[in-house]
Amino acid sequence: MSADTDRTAPPVEILLVEDNLGDARLTREALKEGKVYNNLHWVKDGVEALDFLHKRGKYKDSPKPDIILLDLNLPKKDGREVLQEIKSDSRLMRIPVVVLTTSKAEEDVLKTYTLHANCYVTKPVDLEQFIKVVQSIDNFWLTVVTLPNGK
């Protein structure tokens, strides 16, 4: 995190749902440089994501995330299914979900917005651009936007 990060405020809880270890590491590094103190929780598939959100198993003490970064192409349970479950659950539906995926397919964009994703971002393949995209998400969603207090 940067030196100007406000550590007196409670950290923003971020759930990253990403099966690619490299992308997860890059996301973590980019968020460390962000302006907002945050806790990044990383799960590798859709089943784990729902366990985290519903506080099941090893996630029984997990915090409710303030924002979710969701990949679409996940093992075990697809990101679209995860998004549908989040947005149909009254306890979870107000959590902003940022779809962060490699897919540029128009049907994926349309489907995720139909399922009430809050935004759709295509991951750049270029390393520096990827970091800039994550930092832009951080800046917009954690600095500019006022999120509902879900605590």
What is the meaning of each model-derived region?
Residues N118:
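Short, glycine/charged-rich "phosphate-handling" switch motifs in NTP-dependent
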Residues L74-K77, I86:
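Hydrophobic residue at a beta-alpha junction
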